């Protein structure tokens, strides 16, 4: 996954 996607997923979690 891209860094941006990872950050978004982390934010949701």
UniProtKB/Swiss-Prot annotation:
**The keyword Secreted belongs to this UniProt entry's keyword annotation:** yes
Sorted alphabetically, which keywords does the UniProt record give?
Answer: Amidation, Amphibian defense peptide, Antibiotic, Antimicrobial, Secreted
Q: Which domain of life is it from?
A: Eukaryota
So which tissues is this one expressed in?
A: Expressed by the skin glands.
Q: Where does the record place the modification Leucine amide?
A: 13
Does the UniProt entry include the keyword Secreted?
Answer: yes
Alphabetically, which GO biological process terms does the record hold? defense response to bacterium
Major subcellular site: secreted
Q: Name one GO cellular component term.
A: extracellular region
> What are the subcellular locations of this protein?
Secreted
Q: According to its UniProt record, which protein family does this protein belong to?
A: Belongs to the frog skin active peptide (FSAP) family. Temporin subfamily.
Purpose of the protein: Antibacterial activity against Gram-positive bacterium S.aureus.
> Under which name does UniProt file this protein?
Temporin-1BYa
Q: Which organism is it from?
A: Rana boylii (Foothill yellow-legged frog)
């Amino acid at each position: 996954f891209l860094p941006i996607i990872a950050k978004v997923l982390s934010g949701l979690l």
